[in-house]
């Protein structure tokens, strides 16, 4: 399955497909909520002695991917475009790979 095929499958199960305003809210809030669940799993693993259930974590990451797909579509992008924009930004920011000096001294408009 390609990333854009995944996005189409995610959209098939999304609600409010004809109203983009609530969909972006649902998407971004869902990203925050699911990311919080993943963070909570890590917190319990690192600080509370829990075992890290990687299968459960993988399912949470899948939920994050679903909300990312919905969010991207709500603003008129497919996931391939989003990913390419991100790679282009990172290549411009770190042409020779990650560099802490370049990270520390990023320009103000480098988002």
Language model: regions and residue ranges:
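Flexible "arm" and connector segments at domain edges
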Residues: 1-111
């Amino acid at each position: 399955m390609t990333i854009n095929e995944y996005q189409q499958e995610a959209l098939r199960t999304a609600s409010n497909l004809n109203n983009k305003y609530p969909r972006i809210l649902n998407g971004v809030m869902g990203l925050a909520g699911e990311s919080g669940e993943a963070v909570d799993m890590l917190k319990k693993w690192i600080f509370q002695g829990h075992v890290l259930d990687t299968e459960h974590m993988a399912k949470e990451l899948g939920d994050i991917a679903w909300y990312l797909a919905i969010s991207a579509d709500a603003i008129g992008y497919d996931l391939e475009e989003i990913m390419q924009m991100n790679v282009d930004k990172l290549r411009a920011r770190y042409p020779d790979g990650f560099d802490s000096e370049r990270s520390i001294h990023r320009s103000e408009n480098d988002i």
